Amino acid sequence: MYTVDASVWVNAFDQREPGHLVSRQFLEVLRDQALPIIVPNLVLAEVAGAISRTRQAPVQAQAFATALSRLPHVTVRGLDEVCALHALTLAAQHGLRGADAVYAAVAREAGSTLVTLDNEHLTRLVNLITVCTPAVALAALTPPPQLPA
């Protein structure tokens, strides 16, 4: 199971961003293999806001975030009091921004791998949860090419 940070969804959406193809391929592999994704409901607002700001396309931003919420292999988890308190603890103990702590809390509670482009996730949480970039996650999901016999 995976928790996919908003940075990856936005990167996959925006062809102008470095690493776009890797993020897109990673999400396509998850979709094609019907691998479960759990994300905080916060991801919807973050993705819509980021796309709207960078592309000046509010209708497209809302459509993408809505489509994300309806993917059959994606579970959108609400931020209840238990998760919020868990995120609070992670933010305080690891110096995370609030939204980053919410993703970490969801990943930790679900026992999922957090896939992110956020350097704070990648450096501050390595001893707490499994966290990696889309490139690392994609490499783990994609079998190496077969050499001719």
For each predicted feature, which ranges?
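Short, hinge-like loop/turn segments at secondary-structure boundaries
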Residues: 54-57, 94, 131-134
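Acidic catalytic patch
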Residues: 15, 41-42, 69-93
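Alpha-helix capping/helix-boundary segments
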Residues: 8, 43, 83, 102-103, ...
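Short, well-structured N-terminal submotif of metal-dependent ribonuclease cores
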Residues: 1-39, 54-63, 138-149
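Acidic, PIN/NYN-like endoribonuclease modules and their adjacent C-terminal/linker elements
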Residues: 1, 76-77, 104, 108-149
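Short beta-strand scaffold positions
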Residues: 4, 38-39, 78, 98, ...
